[in-house]
């Protein structure tokens, strides 16, 4: 295979990032939850109806079989352990936000599920779901997970339970890698060509898959290891969930070129005897995305436009900022597409059954994004900065009481800043921030003003003891950047990040805080993104 200039640049970057780091950590083990953290988690538990059974009934509905064991890489390493999250049961421990713990328990309901007659889902093989729709001669597969290994394991498990039928169509709902990266574990390029298997995607799919996942894939990969807690232990002091599912399987990534693009706003297509009505929804959760209904089965596939969590308008891993107003408008359109629909299923989390419940589910999400947008815009025009707005806006109880709209993957404060960035960019209007010093230089000046890093650590310890973790983290960030040799600063910053992670409702925030703490203690990863992991996507 001859590498194009883009492929060559990516390969070079991957090689550069695969080198070993020589930095070392300060050692130690993860801290316990402080009294302040325990009190914050206990207060939230009192405010929420954590024992509401509806989601648990839905997450278990249609269960057929559960996988066990591990998904292995070609080199013998473990990519995914189906039993790694068995500790997620019962009441929340002190070190996990109780609302997030509830979500983690729900996402721990993994396996093969029957959604309705002729529609099945595989959950827990990766962060996303595979949906199987029974056609006249085989399986219409919706989405392909993140890696070849996880997709192949899911399909093998499905065939064990449902019979060995061929793949007769593959549908990519959108251009994020956790929905197409395992394509070569679903069907081979030769099979697509020889049997003329339709590969269906939305208009602009290949361009967007390339721009988001290849052009900045190296940086995004490093940041995603924070967002998803890739290297954290699966434990009550580590990775308990991602909000959208249990785990991302970092195996071998690939892609298949679509043979059929959905180019119209609404377009009907018959795949292996099943009538689909596709709806393009570009520029919402992904730059290229589509939802669909299957009228004869009274079913609606919402892709990732809707999930059992507030989504993010700008992921922690980085991406193009998403349009909250457009996203909410697509949900209005979805309500108009619900005629006769009795089951909603997405490509993450669990389904919703019943027409009225589905309508309420969609309305709640629509209103969350519209409220976030409108209130942010109002405060922008009142002259507030991104951080000020993020500290001001709260969801009304009429929205926050719905668990499916709480911030397990997205976070309201982060989304508010995304709306600001969407309209005004990263600059907050303060001229001091037009050309600020780099973090290391700024930190050295702050430390000189304070009287040295030891005094900064002492002040941070006082803040930590009071439970003022945000201020402690700010002080200690200066101490670590300005004096990287100060082990006390790193150790206290690790403790601080752990408390912030233990109290975080968003799994993405928890994973980011705890990954940072782990790297302060143990040093950064000894290797970066594998060049081999991307090779099939570059072909």
Pin down the residues of each PLM region.
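Divalent-metal (often Zn2+) His-rich catalytic cores of metallo-beta-lactamase-fold enzymes
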Residues: 29-48, 299, 309, 325-388, ...
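Conserved beta-strand hairpin/beta-sheet module of binuclear metal-dependent hydrolase folds
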Residues: 105-165, 289-304
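Active-site metal-binding motif and surrounding structural segment of the metallo-beta-lactamase
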Residues: 137-138, 149-200
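Metallo-beta-lactamase
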Residues: 114, 138-140, 146-149, 163, 206-281, 326-338, ...
């Amino acid at each position: 295979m001859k590498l194009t200039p883009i492929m060559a640049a990516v390969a070079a970057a991957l090689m550069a990032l695969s080198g070993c780091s020589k930095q070392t950590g300060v050692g130690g083990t993860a801290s316990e939850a402080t009294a302040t953290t325990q009190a914050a988690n206990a207060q939230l538990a009192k405010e929420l109806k954590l024992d509401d059974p509806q989601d648990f009934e839905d997450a278990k509905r249609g269960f057929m079989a559960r996988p066990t064991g591990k998904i292995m890489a070609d080199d013998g390493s473990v990519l995914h352990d189906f039993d790694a999250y068995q500790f997620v049961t019962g009441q929340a421990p002190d070190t996990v936000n109780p609302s997030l713990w509830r979500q983690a328990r729900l996402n721990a309901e993994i396996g093969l599920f029957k959604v309705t007659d002729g529609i099945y889902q595989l959950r827990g093989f990766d962060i996303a779901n595979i949906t199987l729709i029974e056609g006249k001669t085989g399986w219409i597969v919706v989405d392909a997970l993140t890696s070849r290994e996880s997709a192949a394991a899911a399909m093998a498990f499905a065939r064990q339970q449902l019979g060995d039928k061929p793949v007769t169509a593959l549908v990519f709902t959108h251009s994020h890698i956790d929905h197409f990266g395992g394509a070569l574990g679903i069907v081979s390029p030769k099979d697509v060509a020889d049997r003329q298997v339709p590969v269906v995607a939305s208009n602009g799919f290949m361009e967007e898959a390339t721009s988001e996942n290849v052009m900045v894939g190296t940086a995004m990969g490093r940041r995603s290891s924070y967002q998803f807690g890739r290297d954290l232990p699966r434990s009550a002091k580590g990775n308990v969930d991602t909000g959208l599912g249990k785990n991302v399987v970092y195996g071998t990534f690939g892609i298949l070129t679509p043979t059929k693009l959905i180019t119209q706003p609404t377009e009907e297509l018959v795949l292996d005897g099943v009538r689909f009505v596709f709806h393009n929804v570009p520029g919402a959760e992904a730059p290229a995305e589509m939802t669909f209904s299957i009228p004869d089965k009274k079913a609606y596939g919402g892709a990732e436009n809707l999930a059992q969590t507030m989504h993010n308008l700008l992921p922690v891993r980085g991406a193009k900022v998403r349009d909250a107003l457009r996203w909410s408008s697509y949900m209005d359109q979805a309500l108009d597409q619900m005629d006769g629909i009795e089951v909603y299923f997405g490509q993450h989390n669990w389904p919703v059954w019943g027409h009225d419940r589905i309508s309420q589910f969609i309305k709640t999400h629509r209103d969350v994004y519209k409220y976030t947008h409108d209130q942010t815009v109002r405060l922008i025009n009142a002259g507030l900065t991104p951080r000020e707005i993020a500290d001001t806006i709260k969801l009304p109880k009429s929205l926050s009481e719905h668990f499916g709209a709480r911030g397990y993957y997205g976070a309201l404060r982060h989304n508010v800043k995304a709306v600001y960035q969407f309209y005004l960019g990263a600059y907050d209007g303060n001229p001091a921030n037009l050309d600020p010093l780099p973090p290391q230089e700024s930190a050295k000046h702050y430390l000189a003003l304070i009287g040295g890093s030891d005094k900064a650590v002492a002040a941070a310890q006082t803040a930590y003891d009071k439970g003022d973790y945000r201020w402690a983290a700010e002080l200690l960030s200066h101490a670590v950047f300005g004096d990287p040799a100060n082990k006390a600063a790193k150790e206290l910053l690790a403790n601080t990040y752990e408390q912030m992670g233990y109290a975080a409702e968003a799994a993405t925030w928890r994973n980011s805080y705890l990954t940072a703490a782990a790297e302060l203690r143990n040093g950064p990863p000894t290797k970066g993104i594998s060049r081999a992991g991307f090779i099939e996507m570059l072909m």
